[in-house]
C-alpha cells in the first residue's frame, strides 16, 4: 500500500518538486529506499463514531423567585431641616435547579471488554489485579470493534454489532445542581440639612446575602468514566455576606460667579465576607458647572469583589485538549530526509529555548518528527486561597451643550478613565499558560505559570506535557486607561417639509490595557494588549437619523481599528517544505508564516421604520456592503475556519430584516 502511494504520479511529482527526485529515483540511485516492502501483520486502531455516544443530553431546569417588600414615608422624622424621609425594605428568595443526563460509552467497560486487563488479551478477564468498579465487570460482553455495523458504507456514524454490546458499554452521566440565594435589604433616605445651594440628602442602608451551591455528580461524571470525556467533581459550599452602606449628596455652590452649580457626592460601603473578613469601598463624585452649558466632572472610587461560589468551591473538572508545545523541535528545523535536527534552520526565539531548558527540557532533543501538538489532560478547580479582587479608579471629563442658538442642538463630551485592578481572578487557558511560561523575556523559567505544567521527563527526546493546571488564580495587577468621546448634533432641515436630522458619534481611544504577574523569584511579567486582538486602540460608531412625520430612516457605521497578535507569539517564517499555518492570504505574501493581522474595519447598516399609534413596521439591511471578516491563522487567533470569532466582526454577511411590533392597548 505504501509503495502504491509513493508511485502515485501526483505524490511522486510532489516529492520531486520538493527534493529533486521521485521516490523511485531515490531508490534506484542508491540514495535512500523509501519503499518499506512487506510489513506483515501490524496492529491497528479502530476509529469509529458510535450512534448516541456523548452527543445526546437531557436537561431539566427550573427556577423560582419570591420577593416581599414594604416602603413608605417616615413622617415623625420631619423636623427642622430634616424632612422628606422615606424607607424601603425587601426580602427575596431564589432557587435554581438543574438536572442533566448524558449517555455514552464507558471507557473502563470498553477496556475490560477488549481484554486490556488480561495478560492474554482475553475479553472480560482481569488477571493483572487492576482495580475495577463492580458495575464495570458485571455483565461484561466481548466487543468487536471491527464489526461491519461500525463502518456503514456512505455514513459517518455506526453502531455496535449487537444490542448486548451496546447495552453493556453504554451508561448515563448524571449531574444535579442547586443554587439558592436569600437577600434581605433595607434603606432610609431623606434630607438632613439645608445649605444656601440646596438640601443635603442622606441615604443609609443594610443588606445581608446568603448563597449556597450544591452541584452533585454521579460516579460517571466525578471520575470521568466516559471514553474521551472530562471528569467533573461538582461544587459544594455556601457563603454569607453582610453589608452596610451610606451615601450623601452635598450642594456646595449654586448660582454664583464661576459656579452655576457645584455638587459633591460621597458614598461608602462596609462589607463583611464570611471568608474574606471586613473590607471597605469608597466613592467621591464632583460636578462643577462654571457656566450653564459646561459641566466639568470627576470621580474617584474603590471596589471590592470576593470570589464567587464557583471560583471558591469548584471541586475539580478534568478533560483533554490539544496543546502546541514550543519546546519540541519544529518541522522546519528537521532535515526533510533524515529527520535530524538542523540548528541553523531553528527559528524559535532565544527566550523560548532558554525557558524550555530552564524548566528541564532540552529544546534541541525533544523531537516528535515535527508533529508538536499533543492531547494533554487539564484540570479546572476552585480555591479558598484566592484573594479578593480590589480596584481603584478615577475619571475626569466634561459635557458641553451649546446655548448660543435655539436653531439646532449640539453637545460634546469627553471622559478620561483609569482603572487599576489588583488580584483579578482569572481562569487561564492552556495557550495563555504556555505563552507566559515559554516566552518570558528573562529566559529563566521563573514564570508563575511554569509550575502549572507537568511533564514526563523520563525520556529527554520525548518530554511530553502530561498535565496542566487551569485552576483559578489571582492576577497581580490589571490596568485599563482610555478616553471616551461623544458628539451629538440635531437640526431641522426644510425641503418643503420639515426633516429632523440628527448625528450621534461615539468613539473610544484605548491608551493602555496591561497585566502584571509577580513570579516566585520576584521578577515581574508585564504584558500590554492595546492594539492586539480584542483590544483595538480605536472604536467608533456613527448613527445618522432622518425623521419626517412618522417615518425614520437610519444609517449606522461601526469602526474597529486594525489589530495584530503579540509579536512575541508570531514566528517570522516557516519552512516551505514543512507544515505551514498560512501560505496564502496575507497581503503581498512571500513567506509561509503565522499571520494574524486585521486591517481597519468598517461595517454599515441601514433601516427605515414607520411608527403608528399602536404598531411599528420597518425593514433594513445589516452589513450593506457585505463586508467580510478578516482571514487569520487559526493557531494565533480564536477562530473558526480562519475567521476570527468573538471580536466584533460580522460573520453573517449582508442580511435583510423585517420587523413588525404591535403594542397592546394602544400607544
Please give the residue ranges for each predicted region.
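Short loop/turn motifs that connect adjacent beta-strands in outer-membrane beta-barrel proteins
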Residues: 73-86, 193-200, 253-262, 293, ...
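Transmembrane beta-strands of outer-membrane beta-barrel pores
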Residues: 74, 91-99, 192, 206-214, ...
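Outer-membrane beta-barrel translocator domains and adjoining extracellular loop/strand segments
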Residues: 100-106, 215-221, 259, 276-282, ...
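Residues that define the transmembrane beta-barrel architecture of outer-membrane proteins
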Residues: 60-66, 180-182, 198, 238-244, ...
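Surface-exposed, low-complexity loop segments enriched in small/polar and acidic residues
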Residues: 1-241, 257, 305-388, 411-484, ...
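C-terminal beta-signal and adjacent terminal beta-strands/loops
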Residues: 511-514, 557-576, 609-667
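Transmembrane beta-strands of outer-membrane beta-barrel proteins
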Residues: 83-91, 200-206, 246, 260-266, ...
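Gram-negative outer-membrane beta-barrel transporters
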Residues: 409-569, 659-663
Amino acid at each position: 500500500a505504501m509503495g502504491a502511494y509513493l508511485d502515485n504520479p501526483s505524490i511522486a511529482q510532489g516529492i520531486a518538486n520538493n527534493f529533486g527526485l521521485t521516490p523511485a529515483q531515490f531508490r534506484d540511485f542508491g540514495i535512500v529506499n523509501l519503499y518499506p516492502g512487506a510489513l506483515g501483520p501490524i496492529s491497528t486502531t479502530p476509529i469509529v463514531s458510535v450512534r448516541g455516544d456523548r452527543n445526546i443530553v437531557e436537561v431539566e431546569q427550573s427556577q423560582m423567585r419570591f420577593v416581599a417588600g414594604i416602603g413608605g414615608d417616615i413622617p415623625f422624622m420631619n423636623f427642622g431641616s430634616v424632612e422628606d424621609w422615606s424607607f424601603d425594605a425587601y426580602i427575596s428568595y431564589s432557587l435554581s435547579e438543574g438536572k442533566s443526563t448524558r449517555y455514552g460509552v464507558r471507557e473502563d467497560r470498553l477496556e475490560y471488554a477488549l481484554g486490556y486487563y488480561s495478560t492474554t488479551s482475553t475479553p472480560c478477564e482481569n488477571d493483572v489485579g487492576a482495580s475495577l468498579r463492580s458495575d464495570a465487570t458485571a455483565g461484561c460482553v466481548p466487543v468487536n470493534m471491527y464489526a461491519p455495523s461500525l463502518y456503514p458504507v456512505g455514513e459517518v456514524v455506526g453502531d455496535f454489532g449487537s444490542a448486548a454490546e451496546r447495552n453493556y458499554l453504554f451508561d448515563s452521566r448524571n449531574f444535579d445542581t442547586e443554587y439558592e440565594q436569600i437577600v434581605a435589604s433595607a434603606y432610609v433616605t431623606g434630607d438632613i440639612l439645608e445649605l444656601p445651594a440646596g438640601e443635603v440628602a442622606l441615604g443609609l442602608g443594610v443588606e445581608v446575602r446568603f448563597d449556597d451551591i450544591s452541584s452533585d455528580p454521579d460516579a460517571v461524571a466525578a471520575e470521568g468514566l466516559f471514553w474521551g470525556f472530562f471528569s467533573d467533581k461538582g461544587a459544594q459550599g455556601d457563603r454569607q455576606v453582610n453589608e452596610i452602606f451610606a451615601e450623601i449628596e452635598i450642594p456646595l455652590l449654586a448660582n454664583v460667579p464661576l459656579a452655576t452649580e457645584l455638587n459633591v457626592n460621597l458614598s461608602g460601603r462596609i462589607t463583611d465576607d464570611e471568608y474574606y473578613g471586613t473590607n471597605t469601598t469608597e466613592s467621591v463624585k464632583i460636578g462643577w458647572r462654571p457656566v450653564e452649558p459646561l459641566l466639568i466632572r470627576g470621580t474617584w472610587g474603590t471596589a471590592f469583589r470576593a470570589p464567587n461560589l464557583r471560583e471558591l468551591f469548584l471541586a475539580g473538572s478534568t478533560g483533554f485538549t490539544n496543546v502546541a508545545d514550543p519546546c519540541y523541535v519544529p518541522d522546519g528545523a528537521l532535515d526533510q530526509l533524515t529527520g535530524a535536527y538542523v540548528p541553523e534552520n531553528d527559528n524559535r526565539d532565544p527566550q523560548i529555548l532558554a525557558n524550555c531548558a530552564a524548566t528541564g527540557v532540552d529544546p534541541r532533543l525533544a523531537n516528535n518528527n515535527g508533529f508538536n501538538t499533543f492531547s494533554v489532560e487539564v484540570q479546572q478547580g476552585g480555591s479558598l486561597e484566592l484573594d479578593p479582587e480590589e480596584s481603584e479608579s478615577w475619571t475626569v471629563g466634561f459635557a458641553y451643550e451649546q446655548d448660543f442658538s435655539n436653531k439646532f442642538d449640539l453637545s460634546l463630551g469627553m471622559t478620561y478613565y483609569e482603572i487599576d485592578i489588583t488580584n483579578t481572578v482569572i481562569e487561564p487557558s492552556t495557550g495563555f499558560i504556555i505563552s507566559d511560561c515559554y516566552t518570558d523575556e528573562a529566559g529563566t523559567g521563573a514564570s508563575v505559570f511554569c509550575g502549572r505544567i507537568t511533564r514526563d521527563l523520563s525520556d529527554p527526546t520525548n518530554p511530553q506535557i502530561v498535565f496542566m493546571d487551569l485552576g483559578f488564580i489571582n492576577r497581580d495587577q490589571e490596568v485599563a486607561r482610555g478616553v471616551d468621546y461623544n458628539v451629538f448634533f440635531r437640526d431641522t432641515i426644510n425641503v418643503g417639509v420639515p426633516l429632523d436630522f440628527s448625528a450621534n458619534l461615539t468613539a473610544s481611544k484605548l491608551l493602555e490595557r496591561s497585566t502584571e504577574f509577580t513570579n516566585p523569584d520576584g521578577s515581574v511579567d508585564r504584558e500590554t494588549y492595546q492594539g492586539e486582538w480584542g483590544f483595538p486602540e480605536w472604536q467608533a460608531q456613527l448613527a445618522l437619523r432622518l425623521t419626517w412625520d412618522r417615518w425614520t430612516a437610519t444609517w449606522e457605521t461601526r469602526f474597529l481599528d486594525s489589530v495584530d497578535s503579540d509579536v512575541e507569539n508570531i514566528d517570522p517564517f516557516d519552512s516551505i517544505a514543512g507544515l505551514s499555518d498560512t501560505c496564502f492570504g496575507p497581503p503581498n505574501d512571500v513567506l509561509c508564516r503565522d499571520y494574524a493581522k486585521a486591517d481597519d474595519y468598517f461595517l454599515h447598516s441601514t433601516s427605515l421604520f414607520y411608527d403608528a399609534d399602536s404598531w411599528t413596521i420597518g425593514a433594513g439591511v445589516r452589513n450593506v456592503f457585505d463586508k467580510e471578516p478578516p482571514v487569520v491563522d487559526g493557531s494565533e487567533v480564536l477562530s473558526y475556519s480562519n475567521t476570527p470569532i468573538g471580536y466584533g466582526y460580522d460573520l453573517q454577511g449582508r442580511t435583510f430584516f423585517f420587523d413588525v411590533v404591535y403594542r397592546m392597548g394602544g400607544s
